[in-house]
Amino acid sequence: MAAIGVLKVPPSSSSSSSSSSSKAIARNLSFTSSHLSGDKIFTLSGRTRRTSGRNPFIVSPKAVSDSKNSQTCLDPDASRSVLGIILGGGAGTRLYPLTKKRAKPAVPLGANYRLIDIPVSNCLNSNISKIYVLTQFNSASLNRHLSRAYASNLGGYKNEGFVEVLAAQQSPENPNWFQGTADAVRQYLWLFEEHNVLEYLVLAGDHLYRMDYERFIQAHRESDADITVAALPMDEARATAFGLMKIDEEGRIIEFSENPKGEQLKAMKVDTTILGLDDDRAKEMPYIASMGIYVVSKHVMLDLLRDKFPGANDFGSEVIPGATELGMRVQAYLYDGYWEDIGTIEAFYNANLGITKKPVPDFSFYDRSSPIYTQPRYLPPSKMLDADITDSVIGEGCVIKNCKIHHSVVGLRSCISEGAIIEDTLLMGADYYETDADRRFLAAKGGVPIGIGKNSHIRRAIIDKNARIGDDVKIINSDNVQEAARETEGYFIKSGIVTVIKDALIPSGTVI
């Protein structure tokens, strides 16, 4: 777990929830080298109601928060009846250069974690232990992380749990790579079909949020839906940037509109009290946007991708709207917690610095009822020598000497030298330590060791892993440049945020 600024850990808003707020079914989750393991005991609240015919009303819980404040009882339980499918995303061009050498879900997050840890942890905390991750681009680091972070046996029903990476591949039947989200799932339907489950849970690998998928699945079953789409309430200012949905009085989706404006936007207003918002919040948030998260009944998925839409490539723009037009029951499920699509450099930067927010961060890694799991690294505690650190999160194994750090996230194994000033910055840290002898040798030859050099000043920046920042460097973008590509010089500027490339060298005295 990361340390918080001035070594004071703020309490999570949901950390006060006790184990009594947890759910039904004792389960054991075992992680590699016993990094995070233990039993969670849950109390039954009654059997899930199932009906033989169509239920005329959607049974959707009130707006979902970060903590598990209600109980569920799936029958059969999620570990036996649900298969998690996490989509690794495309090439991640909007996140470049962070995706230059890694897949988007493998991008570091919050000092100690990676983006993929979010959906995997949400699955494990929701008793979903059979998980596939579909990837296509730069998947080596993602494969390595998942194999080290999650044991081959994750418990679950009959100890059959797993987290397995499926890379895009060519075959005699299909010589093409993944063409989109639906096509990626279609190409591996032969494998998914072998699992004796009721539903497929389709997730994105680049979202930051905490969600109880068991409640999501329960709403799907109780409404007798073919497909259930997770929906986020929106105000008018944000709504134009999303794909919006319109629902009827039963919460059934009847219309889709991508990035609507003007009169088209007004036409997409819905009564969000139907999905559980109170009257005041429903007035503030009269739109609902798709989160790109779906529960799809197994037989429906097979029918849609093989028979109804064999050429469709995308769930959001083709398969889901097509299912609605065919008259299938496509329901909306409201999620009203924190959610961020980490699709751009600016969104990624803001999401990371959001965890330093006072008094309660946008997203808390300190929620003991729903922990975020990751790879065990067995690093020593961070060492801070005469450092002035405020409103910051410090990862494991850092060495910080006589410097100032404010409103920043400092990743694992970071080395920050005397006199440095770090403000509003995300340091991703390093993959390895350099020995003292290595650093002395580099200094003697005029080289630059990994980390931040003496008297350097960094503000509003992202410093990727293993970067070498020399002495007296200024990365402050004093000219307020919004966009610049300086790959040969080791950095990019996007939305005014300077991003130093992984393994880059910024010589002493450089001003950016």
From Swiss-Prot:
Function: This protein plays a role in synthesis of starch. It catalyzes the synthesis of the activated glycosyl donor, ADP-glucose from Glc-1-P and ATP.
Cellular-component GO terms for this entry: chloroplast
Name by which UniProt lists this protein: Glucose-1-phosphate adenylyltransferase small subunit 2, chloroplastic
PANTHER family: GLUCOSE-1-PHOSPHATE ADENYLYLTRANSFERASE LARGE SUBUNIT 1, CHLOROPLASTIC-RELATED (PTHR43523:SF12), GLUCOSE-1-PHOSPHATE ADENYLYLTRANSFERASE-RELATED (PTHR43523)
Pathway: Glycan biosynthesis; starch biosynthesis
Higher taxonomy: Eukaryota, Viridiplantae, Streptophyta, Embryophyta, Tracheophyta
Keywords assigned: Allosteric enzyme, ATP-binding, Chloroplast, Nucleotide-binding, Nucleotidyltransferase, Plastid, Starch biosynthesis, Transferase, Transit peptide
Record field: compositional bias (Low complexity): 12-21
Organism: Vicia faba (Broad bean)
